[in-house]
């Protein structure tokens, strides 16, 4: 189940930006109560829209089959398309999102058009506690999430190098993967990725978020357990060395709104600029047309830049 995958995209984006607003502690009590109610309301709307509530929708959107990946303590559900390409493009979703957060049409068959557009094998999956993946009650920190990504990649890559594409919190996961497995990585794409130089949380914030998610999704849901680790996650990623020297593209939203003024967006941009340390082929693309979910509002922008990375790689 996703964090805020409501049919009304503007509501989803507004919710997400509120979650990642670093000064929420300044909100008055009545505003906090309002946010809690809205999160639960939008979560219910999300559940309905993401599972296609009507019979007509179910008939129109036949579910794309997945493959289970055994990571020892639980199983994850992965979705792939094979074209026997030299490289494998792997998508890592953000906090609170399952693999469908990459589907701008909302149809599971979109994985086929993504693969066709990239002319490449592609792999998407759901972390524990999302979609059809199993639950895991262990600490869901970045190191654990990266370890599970390694298992998923190993099952599908068959020795090939991968192009990693990470959205939001997924950016932290692919960073850790690339640094720990430089020999397996051919390229990187960061889509409005989280970064420790921007994202800062107090324990009170984490408690508020966790209680909301526990109420909406359950204490063992992926979003709830990942939330508990956010403070430690950003402390951990602050200790990571530079990324491997592979082609890297960062795509960043510079769209302003009531919660994100120009100064805030500049800090967001600057945090992604730090990814270029030690990288000789670095491109930073900005957009004011999309909010946090660039892959949904401007899917072609994201796919074109993934394709650009793939085109640079040795044949």
What are these regions (language model features)?
Residues 37-47:
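Bacterial N-terminal signal peptides
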Residues 77, 81-132:
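Conserved HGGG/HGGXW glycine-rich cap/lid loop of the alpha/beta-hydrolase fold
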Residues 124-163:
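Active-site loop/oxyanion-hole signature of alpha/beta-hydrolase fold enzymes
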Residues 191-220:
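Flexible "cap/lid" loop of the alpha/beta hydrolase fold
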Residues 218-286:
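Conserved serine/cysteine hydrolase catalytic core
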Residues 290-315:
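Catalytic active-site module of serine/aspartate enzymes centered on a nucleophile-bearing elbow/loop
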